[in-house]
Amino acid sequence: MKIAIIGAGIVGATGAYQLSKNKEVELVVYDDGVGQATKAAAGIISPWLSQRRNKDWYRLTARGASYYPELMAQLEEDGVTQLPYEQVGALVFKKTPELLGKLEKIATERRKEEERIGTLTKIEAEKISSYVPGWNGTHGAIHCSGGGRVDGKLLVEQQLFLAKQNGASVQQEKVSLTRDEEGKVVVKTNSGLEQFDKIIVASGAWVKELIEPLGYYVDVRPQKGQLIELELETTEEKGEWPVCMLHGEIDILPFADGKIIVGATHENDQGFDLKDSQELQQKMYEEACEVFPVLKQAKWLGSRIGTRAYTSDFLPFFGSIPEENSIFVASGLGSSGLTSGVWIGALLAQLSVDDTPLFDVDSYHPKNYIQKLI
C-alpha cells in the first residue's frame, strides 16, 4: 500500500513514525516547513485542569496526554536518548481563592477516572517559591504532579528521523492536490502527478488550500502564535521546575538547561504572517518578569513563530473526508495541538490501513467541518 502524508507537524510526524513500522506500507511525507505550528511550539501537557466545557475536547486531549508515556517508551526502544517529553508537574494559577477552590474540585473529580493526573496540591501564593525559586507572584495555584512539558520541534525531528530509518521518504517540498483524468485525487509535486492508495492531509491551517480546490468548503482559520526563548546563565537559578500556567494567555516553561520559554500570543487577525511583533513579545516578557523577576537577568535568545489552525467551534477534526474514503485529514487542533496531536496522528495512521478505530471518533468527523460543494 502506498500512502502519502502532507504536512509533518505533530500529527503528520507521529502518523509517519507509526506507519513507517508497517512493512507493507510505502510511505512518502511532504512538508515545506514554512510556518508550522509544532516546530514553533514548546507545550504544557496537562489538560486535566482546563475549565473548557466541551466534553469532546477534554476527552481527546486527556487521551492525548495519557498517550505520551507510551510514545516516549516507543522512542526510547528505538534508540532515542534525549526524550522531548518530561513529566515535571504543572502549576495552574487562579486570581482568587474561590476560583482556585473551584479548579481543585474539578481536578479532583476528574482524577477518579484519570490516574495520570497524579497528586493535586493547593498552594498559597507565598509558597510557590518552594516549587519555583525566585517566584514573586501574588496568586495561588494548583500543583498537578502528572503535568509535563514537550519540545514540539524536537519531537517532530525525532519521529521523522526514525521514520526515514524505517524506509519512509521525506520530501521538503510544497505540494497540492488535484484530480487526474479519471477523477481520482492525486498529489501534484514538482516532478509531476503522484498516485497513492491513501493520502493523509495533516497540514494544519493550510488544509483549506489543499482540500478546497477539490470542490469542498473547509471550516478552518489561521491563528498566529509567538513564543520567546530566554536563558538563565547563573547556575543557581537553573532547576527542574514545574511548568507554570498563568491566569491569562501566558505560560512559563522552564527547562533543566536554563532555557525558559514564555508564551504564547493568540492573534486572530494576522493570517499567515510570520514576522516578529516586538511589542507583543515585550508585553509577554514583562508579564512573565512580574511574577518571575529572575527573568530580568536572562539572556534573550530569540522567538518562535507559527500558525495554528482553529475551527468555528474550536474542536479538532480528523478522519476521511466526505465522499473521498481514501483521503484522510486532520486540522483545527488550536493551542492544545501538542497534547491531542500525537494521539490524532496515531489514530490516522491506524485508520489509513484499518477501518476499525481505536477510539470513538464520531464527534470529530470531518463531515462537520468539510462540506462538498455542488
What are these model-derived regions, one by one?
Residues 44-127, 287-289:
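Dinucleotide-binding Rossmann-like beta1-alpha1 core, especially the glycine-rich loop
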Residues 294-374:
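C-terminal catalytic lobe of FAD-dependent flavoproteins
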Residues 4, 14-21, 30-32, 43-44, ...:
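Active-site substrate-recognition segment that forms the wall
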Residues 81-92, 109, 119-166, 265-270, ...:
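Helix-loop-beta segment of a Rossmann-like dinucleotide-binding subdomain
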Residues 59-63, 93-101, 142-158, 275-280, ...:
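Short beta-strand to alpha-helix junction loop
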Residues 148, 169-185:
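A conserved short coil-to-beta-strand element within the FAD-binding core of flavoproteins
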Residues 1-9:
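Beta1/beta-strand and adjacent pyrophosphate-binding region of the FAD-binding site
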Residues 189-198:
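Core beta-strand elements of the Rossmann-like FAD/NAD(P) dinucleotide-binding domain
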